[in-house]
């Protein structure tokens, strides 16, 4: 484990999270499904990023199902569908694995991973469309667990400009950080982006950890700025 930035804006790297073969299998599973990155539930091509991506459900790939317990153990959070006594998962409590590919020139402008600007008892404000919508049953993106599925010859670092941190992709490693404060508000210091790929191809897998499935793993703070 490597600490890139200390608390309260903790950024960690875990090395050898995936073997080279496991990373290659995720890339192979994703390649036939890849589409141009978009926003707004796939209805609008994103101008913030130049990449392709896809979503893989746990039960669609035995490979992902086998990896999920490992992700849970590393992050200490529920990252995949929690199973009930009948062996069935509550899909509304988690977010599927996203695989993304950035070719030469591919990048992702600085952004925040939380989906909501702020929350009220009866509605939330969605950060992209600035519209009031009912609360998501999954809750917001509490934390991010991003795995590098390839090395990159040049460029492609993950940068946190407000913290002065830049992490070079290393195949099989993963980066972990919290997006929300204990109060549930977005941590604006966690602004980050994917630097342009200068040479090579960058593959990553993102597992966004949601609030609802982890409400007992991440106690709330008693102050709005916590």
Language-model features, listed with the residues they occupy:
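Fe(II)/2-oxoglutarate oxygenase catalytic core
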Residues: 1-176, 180-226
């Amino acid at each position: 484990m490597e600490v890139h930035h200390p608390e309260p804006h903790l950024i960690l790297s875990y090395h050898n999270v995936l073997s080279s073969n496991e990373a290659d299998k995720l890339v192979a599973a994703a390649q036939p499904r890849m589409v141009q990155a978009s926003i707004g539930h796939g209805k609008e091509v994103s101008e913030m990023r130049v990449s392709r991506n896809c979503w893989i459900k746990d039960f669609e790939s035995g490979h992902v199902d086998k990896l999920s317990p490992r992700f849970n153990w590393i992050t200490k959070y529920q990252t995949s569908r929690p199973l009930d006594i009948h062996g069935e998962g509550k899909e509304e409590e988690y977010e599927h694995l996203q695989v993304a590919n950035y070719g030469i020139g591919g990048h992702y402008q600085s952004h925040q991973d939380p989906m909501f600007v702020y929350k009220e008892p009866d509605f939330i404000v969605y950060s992209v469309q600035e519209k009031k919508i009912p609360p998501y049953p999954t809750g917001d993106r509490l934390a991010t667990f991003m795995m590098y599925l390839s090395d990159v010859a040049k460029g492609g670092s993950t940068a946190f400009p407000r913290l002065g941190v830049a992490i070079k992709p290393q195949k099989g490693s993963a980066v972990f950080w919290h997006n929300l404060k204990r109060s549930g508000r977005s941590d604006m210091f966690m602004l980050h982006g994917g630097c342009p790929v200068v040479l090579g191809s960058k593959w990553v897998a993102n597992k966004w950890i949601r609030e609802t499935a982890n409400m007992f793993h991440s106690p709330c703070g008693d102050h709005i700025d916590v």
